[in-house]
Design a protein with these regions (language model features):
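Active-site loop/turn elements of alpha/beta-hydrolase fold enzymes
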Residues: 3-8, 83, 132-134
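Active-site loop signature of alpha/beta-hydrolase-fold enzymes
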Residues: 8-11, 86, 138
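Primarily recognizes the serine-hydrolase "nucleophile elbow" in alpha/beta-hydrolase
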Residues: 22-94
C-alpha cells in the first residue's frame, strides 16, 4: 500500500523544501494504513513493513516510535532512505530497521543517523545502516540523472544537492530485497 499524506492536505508540493508539513504529522497516516492492512484477509498482519524516503523516512522512524512494537500488532520491519535523524535522537524501537544513507548528502546529513544506529545497536536493537560514499540525496532515483542538481530553496534557502548514483541505487535495492525477505518471510524472527 502506498500512503499519500499530501493530497488530503491540499496537494502540498514543497514539503521537503518548505517545512509545510512536519514528519510527525504523517504518523497517523501510517498508523491508519497499518490498521487498515490488518483488517484485510489477504494480508498477514505479522508481515507488514514500513518504508519511506527523506521526509517520509523521518516519518517512518517517528511512526515506529508510536506504533505497537509487537510484530503481530505493529510493523515487522522498516526501511528508511536518507532520513534526517537529528529530530529522532532520543528514539527507540524494537522493529528491525534498515537505513540507507548518502555519504555526501548535504540535505539530510548521514552523521546523525550513523550515530543513532550505532547507539541503538549497542543497546541490542536490530538497526542496520549503510552509507554510500560520495552519494547524494536521492541517490536511488534514476530520474535525477548522473549530474548533480542544486535545489536552491532546500534547507531554508541554503540549498542542497541531489544526484543519482547507479551503483549505490542497485546495491540499496539488493539490500532492501534481502532485508525484507529476511524479516517478512513466514517464520522469520
Amino acid at each position: 500500500m502506498r500512503v499519500n499524506s499530501f493530497t488530503a492536505r491540499g496537494g502540498l508540493k514543497r514539503v521537503c523544501g518548505g517545512g509545510i508539513l512536519e514528519p510527525a504529522a504523517r504518523v497517523p497516516d501510517a498508523l491508519a494504513a497499518l490498521a487498515h492492512l490488518r483488517t484485510r484477509p489477504d494480508v498477514d498482519p505479522g508481515r507488514i513493513a514500513l518504508m519511506g524516503w527523506s521526509h517520509g523516512a523521518m516519518a517512518t522512524l517517528m511512526t515506529l516510535g508510536a506504533a505497537p512494537e509487537e510484530p503481530w500488532l505493529g510493523f515487522r520491519a522498516a526501511v528508511a532512505y536518507y532520513p534526517g535523524c537529528r529530530s529522532v535522537q532520543g528514539w527507540r524501537t524494537r522493529t528491525s530497521v534498515l537505513m540507507l544513507l548518502g555519504g555526501a548528502d548535504d540535505w539530510t546529513a548521514p552523521g546523525p543517523c550513523q550515530y543513532l544506529a550505532t547507539r541503538l545497536r549497542q543497546a541490542g536493537l536490530d538497526v542496520t545502516q549503510v552509507t554510500y560514499p560520495g552519494a547524494h540525496h536521492g541517490f536511488d532515483n534514476p530520474l535525477l540523472g548522473p549530474s548533480p542538481h542544486l535545489i536552491p530553496d532546500a534547507l531554508g534557502g541554503r540549498g542542497a544537492t541531489t544526484q543519482y548514483d547507479p551503483a549505490g541505487a542497485e546495491d540499496s535495492f539488493r539490500r532492501v530485497r534481502e532485508f525484507l525477505a529476511a524479516h517478512l518471510t513466514a517464520g522469520a524472527p
